[in-house]
Curated annotation (Swiss-Prot):
It comes from Azospirillum brasilense. It catalyses: trans-3-hydroxy-L-proline = 1-pyrroline-2-carboxylate + H2O. Pathway: Amino-acid degradation. Catalyzes the dehydration of trans-3-hydroxy-L-proline (t3LHyp) to Delta(1)-pyrroline-2-carboxylate (Pyr2C). Together with LhpI, is involved in a t3LHyp degradation pathway to L-proline, which allows A.brasilense to grow on t3LHyp as a sole carbon source. The lineage of its organism: Bacteria, Pseudomonadati, Pseudomonadota, Alphaproteobacteria, Rhodospirillales. Gene3D superfamilies: Diaminopimelate Epimerase, Chain A, domain 1 (3.10.310.10). Belongs to the proline racemase family. InterPro entries: Hydroxyproline_Metab_Enz, Pro_racemase_fam. Homodimer. This is Trans-3-hydroxy-L-proline dehydratase. GO terms for molecular function: trans-L-3-hydroxyproline dehydratase activity.
């Protein structure tokens, strides 16, 4: 059998959200930064992303990451995040998945009771700490990038829901944060179609009306998704939220970068005190925890350094092939 390409992956989920780690088979991407390597792959090898994210190997809500060499002295490896629409700047559930895999599979030197993992991502360097008892990885906490409110109390007009008001905040990606209660949007599986329509309409309207540019990373220059908050199902949770991002993709986890942005938003609005913990619940009831480590600035913008905690589990290993004779080898999507 003659094949065009073979790709090896580790299959992980974080709070229910898939994360496919590509460990071999990728072309070597040139570049001194992760952003440069991402740009090269987007220009020269985007068909690999489509093959691994789209059906029949993936699905409309698939997510993954390409391992690459580190670009900073404290990192163990780098990652390029991929999804159904393209490439992202940050992925907190991906950081948790990568860190879990790195410790479970011995990609880093392991120490009891906690192992450090350094990751270079498009949004910058991220440091994670994984509980390790000598046999199994446990919860992961990571120090998020500086997070902040970009604009408060901004409004957009949507075709189906009218005027929607919320905050634009950054936690590794820009999100439009909004309360779902006024729009009868419970954060539950049964409401997913309405949540998707709402999130997609708000994201499109916000990107059209509010140009965003990260003060220090100009390549981060769009609103990645809508985060809709409402009441949780578990009494120990602070809130539930649903992130609709990329091309109408729904995060099954509570969204790591979104949790970082939410921590910044609540803290800067006086709704989360230093030392308090946000217990953030997902659409399927899984939980991330977030808290403020310290205050900082990004350019002239007041910001905080959040810590986000969650758990991931390896659920498989795979070898994928690309066969040019297959008319669907680079995938398709049916919603």
């Amino acid at each position: 059998m003659k094949i065009t390409r073979s790709l090896s992956t580790v299959e992980v989920h974080t709070g229910g959200e898939a994360f496919r780690i590509v460990t071999s088979g990728l072309p070597r991407a040139p570049g001194d930064t992760i952003v440069q390597r991402r740009a090269w792959l987007k220009e020269n090898a985007d068909e690999i992303r489509r093959a691994l994210m789209f059906e029949p190997r993936g699905h409309a809500d698939m997510y993954g990451g390409y391992l690459t060499e580190p670009v900073s002295p404290n990192a163990d490896f780098g990652v390029i995040f991929v999804h159904n629409e393209g490439y992202s700047d940050h992925c907190g559930h991906g950081v948790i998945a990568l860190s879990t895999a790195a410790v479970e599979l011995g990609w880093v030197q392991r120490t009891v009771p906690e192992t450090r993992v350094g990751i270079d991502a498009p949004c910058g360097f991220i440091e994670a700490f994984v509980k390790w008892d000598g046999e199994h990885a446990g919860p992961v906490r990571f120090v998020n990038v500086p997070s902040f409110i970009w604009q408060r109390d901004v409004s957009v007009e949507t075709p189906s829901f009218g005027t929607v008001t919320g905050d634009i905040a950054y936690g590794g990606a820009f999100y439009f944060y909004v309360d779902g209660a006024p729009f009868d949007l419970p954060v539950r599986e049964a409401a997913v179609e309405k949540l998707i329509r709402f999130g997609a309409e708000v994201k499109a309207a916000a990107n059209a009306k509010y140009p965003v540019v990260h003060p220090e990373i100009p390549e981060i220059n769009h609103i990645y998704g809508t985060i809709i908050a409402n009441a949780p199902r578990h009494p120990g949770s602070t809130q539930a939220n649903c992130c609709v991002f990329a091309d109408r993709e729904v995060d099954r986890s509570p969204t790591g970068s979104g949790t970082g942005g939410r921590v910044a938003q609540l803290y800067q609005r006086g709704l989360l005190a230093a030392g308090d913990t946000l217990v953030n619940e997902s659409i399927v009831g899984t939980v991330f925890k977030g808290r403020v480590l310290r205050e900082t600035t990004v350019g002239d913008i007041p910001a905080v350094i959040p810590e986000v905690e969650g758990s991931a589990h390896i659920c498989g290993f795979a070898n994928w092939i690309v066969d040019e004779r297959d008319p669907l080898t680079y995938g398709f999507l049916v919603r």
